[in-house]
Amino acid sequence: MADKEILAAEAGSATIESLAGDRSARRPLEIFAAVFVAAGLIYSVHLGADALGASEAYSAWAAAKPGVCAIVRTPVLHDPGKQLLYYVVLHYYTRIFGLSEISLRSMSVIFSLTTLALVFALGCEMLDEHAALAAAAMWAFNPLAVVFAHTARMYPMFSAIALAHLLTLWRVRSRPGVIGAIGCGILGAAMPYTHLAGLLILGAEAAILLRDFVRGRRDTLAWMAIALAIGLFIPYIPVAIQQSQGLIYGHWLDYLGPPYNYPLAAKIAAALVAAGFTLWLVLGRAVERDADEPTRLLVAWIGLPTLAFIVGSVILHPMFNPRYLAPGMAAAALLIAASIGAWSTKWRNLLAAGFALACLIMLPFARSRPEPWRDLAAQVAAGGPSDPVFFEAGFVSNEDTANVANGGFPFGYYSVPFDYYFAGANPRIAIPGFDSETARMTIEERVSSAGGGWLVSWKEGGALNAELPDPKRFKADEKLRAERHPVGVVDL
């Protein structure tokens, strides 16, 4: 009898321990669910409060095209560097939900939440549940993640596709399967169709697989996935090359600026540093206990595209903007969690919680002022219906390149966000943004006959004054000036 009581007690104790273990195992998932819900609420706040920015208006303009063929022509002809997959997906999404600010931005919220879920899933696969939770907490409330979620642009979609591709590649490496390899290849092709930086990610993944090959690991299906991704993108390569040329030319007039003209020695040094870092990633001695080397993989996946942009900017031409690395920013949370966790799991958890709390405190102060398109439309509507609205044709340029002739945006870059909010009959007139004399003469002629007008300009100071009509005959008042982008509105 006593033996039976002892056995019963031991069985009961084992059951209690099992239940406690199950609850402990579920705790990271339960906490992540709470983080996910909180992130969804934060991402969804103020979606329709701010006017669309100029780039967001281009997303709406492309999505409103009648079909896929017209959408494909939009980035090719008018908006170099923007890839078509985001516009196509947004087109069908807005056919269901409409073209309002909330509808346009809500798709970014969906992809941002998908990115957050993929950060957690990758952490569980590559590291452990607690590291995954720490990484998800660091990314969920990061101001960058919130900005991406609040913007109707391709970056949340790009991040979600890239992280989904990384997850499938990881699984194909560790648990090879034909279906998984095909899915990995399709996702890999979707990356450059969303943003050309996806090609650099594919290159980084090829370096990872090359390391596996050098160490005697074949990864046949993983190589097939990369080959499938490249094969599916090949038909678009001529268009991508044309777009890249237009993108680089257009953006050196704008925020990228002209070549840095570093000395040859600096260019050689940059190339050698990049080559050395790549060789270390591919051939360096293993320092991780896990044969899959998750930390090295993350370093390569994040670091090699970043290095390519930096070295390309030094050797060739400025080509780097931090938002091009949106997938790497999300993956960096995993790398940070893994690195700190290797030192101390306690400090990793504390720092992750502290960082998330700090981000939540910062969020109310991180909002920038919206662009003035809504206000501009209201002011023009309050004026005369015959007053022309002038837009500068050409790429948006900086002060040093304002007079460089170019064929970008022949209808005027800022006409698209203006037309999103304004449906009046006022004539829209494109003037050459790189030819101030011709622009001024056109403005004087049309304003004289109409009795008034509006100039929407990206210029400031002397460059703007050179376009304005003769102050002895015309009065010009600056009505609006945006903070984030060089948008000025002058009432003539």
Where are these predicted regions, by residue range?
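Short, intrinsically disordered terminal tails adjacent to the first/last structured region
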Residues: 1-25
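Terminal, non-globular segments
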Residues: 25-492
